[in-house]
Amino acid sequence: MIHFTKMHGLGNDFMVVDGVTQNVFFSPEQIRRLADRNFGIGFDQLLLVEPPYDPDLDFHYRIFNADGSEVEQCGNGARCFARFVRNKGLTQKNKIRVSTNSGKITLRIERDGNVTVNMGVPVIEPSQIPFKAKKSEKTYLLQTPMQTYLCGAISMGNPHCVIQVEDVQTVNVDEIGSSLTRHERFPKGVNVGFMQVINPGHIKLRVYERGAAETLACGTGACAAAAVGQLQDKLDKQVRVDLPGGSLIINWEGEGKPLWMTGPAEHVYDGQIQL
C-alpha cells in the first residue's frame, strides 16, 4: 500500500507521496490512472518527495503531470511540498531547501500558514527557455495558421508564453492554449498564460498548462506573468495575481534577481492506495 496526501494550492490539486520513508515508483500509465477523476484519486499533478542528492539540501522535489509526463517545476506544488514535509515530520525547519529537475529553490513557511517560495531567477535567454528566437526580446510575434499573437517568453524552471488580453473571462483559453502549447518555436512545449492588467500592482490570469490543460491556478504561470509584465514596463515590483482558484503575491526586484511567490497550501485528506 502507498500512503499519500491530497493537497491543493488555490484549487491546483496534488497527490503528494513521501518517497523518503516509502520505496515508491510510478509508471506513466499508473500516474494517468491515479489522476483520473472518475476512476482514480484525481489530481493535476503528482508530487514526489525524495531524499536530497546534495548534502546541503533538504529534499529532492519531482513533479508529474496528469498525463504521466515528468516536468521541471510547479510553483503551487512547491508550497504544498513545504507544508507536507513539515506536517509529516520529515523536517522541523521553516526554511527548506530543495532541488528540482531545473535547479534549486528555497521554501519558507510563514507564521500565517502561507508559504513563500524563492522561485529562482527568471530565465529570459531564448535558448535556455527553450524558445526559438534570434535574440532576447520583451515581446515576440508568435504565428499560428489562424492568428498571430504578441507574447512574452520566459522560463520559471518551465517554459511560459504570456499573452496580454483585454478580458480573461471572454478569451478562449482551451482553443488558443491547445494551439500554442505545442508550437514549433517551443521545442519542449509551453504553458500559455492569458494576462489582464487591472493596474500596475494587480493582474488577472488564466493559464493553459502543458500536459494538464487549464487549471484553477498555476504558480509558475503567475510568476511568469508578473515578470513579463515588469519587463514590458506594465507592472510594479509587487503584483497581486488573481487566478480562478484565488490570489498569489509575486515580488521581483528585476532582471537577474530571484523572484518570490507567496500563497496558501491546503491539506485535504490522507489516504492509502494499492498500485
From Swiss-Prot:
UniProt: substrate binding residues: 12, 45, 65, 75-76, 158, 191, 209-210, 219-220
Keywords: Amino-acid biosynthesis, Cytoplasm, Isomerase, Lysine biosynthesis
Family named by the database record: Belongs to the diaminopimelate epimerase family.
EC number: 5.1.1.7
GO biological process, one term: lysine biosynthetic process via diaminopimelate
Protein name: Diaminopimelate epimerase
InterPro entries (alphabetical): DAP_epimerase_AS (IPR018510), DAP_epimerase_DapF (IPR001653)
Active site: 74, 218
Function text: Catalyzes the stereoinversion of LL-2,6-diaminopimelate (L,L-DAP) to meso-diaminopimelate (meso-DAP), a precursor of L-lysine and an essential component of the bacterial peptidoglycan.
Disulfide cysteine pairs (residue numbers): none
GO molecular function: diaminopimelate epimerase activity
Oligomeric form and interacting partners: Homodimer.
Pathway where this protein functions: Amino-acid biosynthesis; L-lysine biosynthesis via DAP pathway; DL-2,6-diaminopimelate from LL-2,6-diaminopimelate: step 1/1
PANTHER family xref list: DIAMINOPIMELATE EPIMERASE (PTHR31689:SF0), DIAMINOPIMELATE EPIMERASE, CHLOROPLASTIC (PTHR31689)
Protein's UniProt keywords contain Repeat: no
Positions marked as site (Important for dimerization): 269
